[in-house]
Amino acid sequence: MHKIINHPLIKDKLTRMRKVSTVSTVFRTNLEELTQLMVYEATKDLELNEIEIETPVVKNAKGYKLKNKICLIPILRAGIGMVDGVKSLIPTATIGHIGLYRNEETLKPVEYFKKFPKNISESDVIILDPMLATGGSVVEAVNIIKKYNPKSIKFVCIVAAPEGLEYVQKIHPDVDVYIAALDDKLNENGYITPGLGDAGDRIFGTK
């Protein structure tokens, strides 16, 4: 399943991020805020346990808590820019990291870094990456994460190319994908158009 989150605030913030004149600090701030809006939607179906609590007024009141732990896994490096937006909503979430690069001969993603919390098998996992281009990195990230048997896996991104979205859903139809915008296509250089440019460079001001 994939869902395009259609909301005026998302469209406004995404437009600011797309503009070539947007400086790194503004890009990062809007990415963080946009991620909050995206994750609010992506977590609507999380399971809850009913609990009993005491309020200032009554001793026995009904409350709720998340049934499973939450684990955030940003894909390095651009995915790091989305973490704080989620942590502000789910401060108890643990964080793992996956680093992938593309082999220039085979064009396939290769893992160069991986560090996961010990509780990942007890967690609902949310993968974070601003861009879904060819889909190769996301598919490989899911391949790696599935070996740890998490409760569920969701993927949250900002912009996606149709080619990448189709590939992810073909290989991992059980992973729900949440996007702010489905863009037109990949250009001859593999960039999403109209896209955001190189999200990592724009987040960290490295170009």
From Swiss-Prot:
It catalyses: UMP + diphosphate = 5-phospho-alpha-D-ribose 1-diphosphate + uracil. 5-phospho-alpha-D-ribose 1-diphosphate binds at residues 77, 102, 129-137, 198. Its EC number is 2.4.2.9. Uracil binds at residues 192, 197-199. Binds 1 Mg(2+) ion per subunit. The magnesium is bound as Mg-PRPP. Pathway: Pyrimidine metabolism; UMP biosynthesis via salvage pathway; UMP from uracil: step 1/1. Its cofactor is Mg(2+). Allosterically activated by GTP. The keyword S-adenosyl-L-methionine does not apply. InterPro entries: PRibTrfase_dom, PRTase-like, Upp_B, UPRTase/APRTase, Ura_phspho_trans. Pfam families: UPRTase. Keywords: Allosteric enzyme, Glycosyltransferase, GTP-binding, Magnesium, Nucleotide-binding, Transferase. One of its GO terms (molecular function) is magnesium ion binding. GO terms for biological process: UMP salvage; uracil salvage. The keyword Lyase does not apply. Belongs to the UPRTase family. NCBIfam families: PRK00129.1, upp. Catalyzes the conversion of uracil and 5-phospho-alpha-D-ribose 1-diphosphate (PRPP) to UMP and diphosphate. PANTHER family: ADENINE PHOSPHORIBOSYLTRANSFERASE (PTHR32315), URACIL PHOSPHORIBOSYLTRANSFERASE, CHLOROPLASTIC (PTHR32315:SF4). This is Uracil phosphoribosyltransferase. It comes from Ureaplasma urealyticum serovar 10 (strain ATCC 33699 / Western). The gene is upp.
